[in-house]
Amino acid sequence: KKKIRILEPSVGIGNFIPLLVEKYEDKDEVIFDLVDIDNNSFVVLKNILDKLKLPKKFKFNFINADFLTHNFNVKYDIIVGNPPYKKLTNNQELLSLYKFNARNNETNNLFSFFIEKAISLGNFVSLIVPKSLINSPEFNITREILKEQNLLKICDYGEKGFKGVKIETISFLLETSIKKQSESIVIESYITETVEEKRKDYLLSDKFPYWLLYRNEEFDEISEKMKFDIFNSFRDRQITKQITKENGKYRVLKSRNVGNNEVKELENYDCYIDDTENLAVAKFLNRDDVVMIPNLTYYPRASFLPKNTITDGSVALLTLKNGSRLPTERDLEYYGTKEFERFYRVARNYGTRSLNIDNNSVFFFGLLKDID
């Protein structure tokens, strides 16, 4: 096309504009519709654009509005940007409006609403979003929506997306208007420094609870040893330092207390609690076969929850969910092996921060098939 229309839904000070200008300098006309809710951004952005002294064929429209509620009557060739990553919690009325227009109303996170609206308005859509999109339960529906489009590429920046910001990000590129989907997808990774083309039905397989960008033969071989989807996961949200003390009736275990089939005593670390009456985690007290796994770690290890103890939010508690056999110490020992660690890194998409053990990721703590 000689004339193209580009929408940037949350333009800020226009970081992507110089790159887009360079990419499409061969076009006869490029119209940018630049949207931002913050008018101050436009003051800075207009100054920057003046200094760039761009040819007349680049036209800019400034739309000071909320992208999610603004009515657009144009279909865009390209939608590109970096939507806000934040949960809307303080304005229920606005949140209800956003959710009313969205298929995924199980999240309060703005970037998910941005993805859906961008797909409805553009032919090609590319957004930089948090990596939790790939695996978090709250984005299960968003991933389904993305799979319905023709996904062309996912780029995993790890923590390298934004200087000085400790957040893991990815970007995706998709085409919305195609009848036949491509069978493969390109995965570019700044973590492994690789660019690979793989089959979509392999990486985005319904066999697993979320997308596995780094799935490989070794992962598949290890998968064959285990039966998955065994446990539910629970994490406490109530226990804080305000309610624990140095000694008391029940010991409160934290992540560093959990070893490989052992519970460690740690000086100046252990804490206790007397009253568990109003704590949700109390339902696990003195139950058999509750498995503890530290929450945010690359080095999984597990042990059974001992008598007269509970855990804080740094430990996930796993309980059987579907009439499987009981876990044994040998199963738990396997979670601490180098082999399982390699498997788990792939299962967690080489994440460093989005490592919560939730009801999606707990799927991968399987039980060994060779134990009956």
What positions do the PLM features span?
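Flexible, charged surface loops at secondary-structure boundaries
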Residues: 1, 72-75, 120, 244-247, ...
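Conserved class I S-adenosyl-L-methionine
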Residues: 3-10
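Structural motif
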Residues: 5, 78, 290-291
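Conserved Rossmann-like nucleotide-binding pocket used by diverse enzymes
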Residues: 7, 33, 63
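Signature of N6-adenine DNA methyltransferases within the class I
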Residues: 10-20, 29, 36-42, 54, ...
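Conserved hydrophobic residues forming the short capping helix/wall of the S-adenosyl-L-methionine
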Residues: 24, 49, 53
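Conserved SAM-binding loop
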Residues: 45-46
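Polybasic, glycine- and aromatic-enriched phosphate-binding surface used to engage nucleic acids
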Residues: 217-372
